[in-house]
Amino acid sequence: MKLLVLGGTHHVGRAVVETALERGDDVSTLNRGLSRAPTPGVRPLIADRTDPEAVRRALDGHEWDAVIDTWAWAPRVVRDTARLLSGRAGHYGYVSSRGVHRWPWPAGADEQAPLVDGDPGSTDDADYAAAKRGGELAVLEYFPEAALLARAGMILGPYEDVGRIPWWLRRLSKGGRVLAPAPAHTPLQYIDVRDLATWLLRSAERGLSGAFTTTGPPGAITLGDLLTTALEVTGCDTELVWAEPELLLRHDLPLGMEFGLRLPDGSAPSGMHDADVSAALAEGLTTRPLRETLADTWIWLQSEGDPAPRADAPSPDTWLDAAAEQRLLDHLSR
């Protein structure tokens, strides 16, 4: 399959590129050429996506079977690119988000849950949900019968740059006593970035279209499963000290916010980790074991170091007060 990946250097895009190469696909990428050297075996096309004329020049003379787009900012950029790719590509896969569903999310929500409003021509990226919905509409405008909208849940695995698992692995690897947001039996729902990439590529090959909630099956793992497995992966002598949400809130320690288990005001959102993914599973979505996801993330971190921080996804280090955490640990040990 001749594939164009828009981006291709970070997190989801990088996983898509590497998975496609492993499959034997003919892979091109389009990006600014600033973040990382091109992956060996890739044909790099250089352009700033916010400059439609530069994108047009980069695309000129090329055609692809499929395009994968991970853009998360102003929808107008998606619309400009989709317009330029119309007639050059047979399939457009857009990595969207469950965030396009209107808040609050109902328990067990599927693809039919109400959606936020979005404008495909908007230049505003301050509202993530509206931007992603606008991106969806932009793709549908130019690929009405050939658009795959992957509404992803929490994406974990190697190359993660949004301050979840890398932060927890580093935190646990230091040893000692570490606060964890109780209860340990809280369910979590996530997808390994490589499983998402594999599904996107297989779906592109089949010409699958439509909107799909793409995350792991509900009820498969808990927060306790994740953190205890992370401890085992790091091999460190660390003690998890579980603190109830009310206690964390009282001490201004918003642990759990990184997993969407609580909001900045301390409230616990509904519907975050129990989405109905039966449609994607029926279309071939598969998920790997939790231990594999965590172990491979730890190997990547040790090999490449921590990813550069993102302004739109600050590390928990920026909002978790270490002194307040120690005070609560001292309180719980009395």
Which stretches of residues belong to each language-model region?
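N-terminal Rossmann NAD(P)H-binding glycine-rich loop of SDR-like oxidoreductase domains
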Residues: 3-23
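N-terminal Rossmann-fold cofactor-binding loop
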Residues: 30-35, 48-49
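NAD(P)-cofactor binding segment of oxidoreductase domains
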Residues: 62-119, 136-140
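Conserved beta-loop-beta element that borders a ligand/cofactor-binding pocket
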Residues: 96, 135-159
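Substrate-positioning beta->alpha
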Residues: 163-168, 181-206, 210-213, 225, ...
